[in-house]
Amino acid sequence: HQTKNKQIINLAPFDLTQDKAKIIFANKYTPEYFLQGGMKGLARFVSDHIVKTDTGESIYACYDRSRDVFKYKNEAGEYINDIKAVRLVEIIHPAAAEHSRAMNDKFHEEYMSALSEYDEENITNKITQNELDCKEMKATQSRESNFLHKYLNTELDSFSKELGNNIK
């Protein structure tokens, strides 16, 4: 005899679209989330702003953290499993990539501006180092903005674990 614990989740219908995600990112994605780094900051942002309605109702929930099983309710009222948050990632990826790229560019420009305040004797060395730093930042950004392709491996595991830690 095997006992199954059934968790009851009351969710509002999942009506998130790429257009809605884009608007939410445009209005609420701040440097604070970006600077938390990678999947941790993104998961916190998603938990704070994406998976809840304007009135605070959940539209998406972590059902089984150990197996990375999330659930949402479709338009017909049926609960759908979203293993490793694949459906959610497909929806938010374009907006997440766009806004993380914009944040990266913003911080790059600020870094270059601050760098220009140094004297000319040291500026060549600083610019060379900055260019290396920028290449590294762009490589990091490229890896993060292409996480949709990588998420089948470690990135999605990391995101879904972080999301599971943030969604109650």
Report each predicted region and the residues it spans.
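Extended amphipathic coiled-coil helices
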Residues: H1-K168
